[in-house]
Amino acid sequence: MARWDYKKDIDYNAIDMQKVRGDSFLFQLLTIASFIEITSDTYAKNLSEYYDDNPKAVQWLQEDWEKEEIQHGEALKRYVLHVWPEFPWQKAYERFLELYLPLCNTGSFQPTRGLEMLARMIVETGTSTMYRAFEDYAKSLDEPVLAGLTHYIYKDEVNHYSYFDRYFKYYNQSENLGRKEILQVIVQRLKEASSEDIEMGFQSIYEIQNDAVFDRSSYELFKKELNKLAKKHYPYSMAIKMTMQPLNLNKTLETTMVPVIRGAMKVLGI
Ligand SMILES: [Fe+2]
Ligand SMILES: [Fe+2]
């Protein structure tokens, strides 16, 4: 079970509206994150099917991971609706589901259970570092409620990473994955992390707010803002450390790999 409860632990009435209400980029970021997080039940179901050999993993996925991810979505949704109550969240979310659900199937899973655990580690690296950046951004805006909320989420994501790491190691005892295979999955997941779901979230907001066909150039502007945020607030060294951990490298190799991973992240726009 989640170690915090957004209904009790987040005081939405204490939000400093002046600091955030005019920030449309922040609105987009938090709304997109709420859409993706709140849809975690679909992933939990697919993952539980994939790991039906492992009742302990399934229990953790259903009783902890899924509940915590959905809580992230609910907590962010409430923040968005508190600050921007005129936004038809539900309507935009329904559009998001139309675009996003066809992508959520076990067909996109890795070929082995160990490699899929590894892919989940990369996803959790993405979320951990993203919420760490959001927390830092919220602090720079001097909005303590958002800083507190994103800190809670950040802690959960790091915890998810360590669970998936544990299961990755468990499966790797029998799968004996080589570094090349591991690196391939890392790079592949890094590519995916930077794209589709965020763009679909953006598209749904755009369509509902403008009542118009999606204009890709507005997404390019959003990405520019995202890059600006990353430059100031993204914890790159934490991301690199978490990304490289499954490679289990010695110190010399690790030093060699840092610029490779950093370079890959740059190319991918992370
Ligand atoms: Fe989450
Ligand atoms: Fe997570």
Please describe what each predicted stretch is.
Residues 1-270:
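Non-heme di-metal
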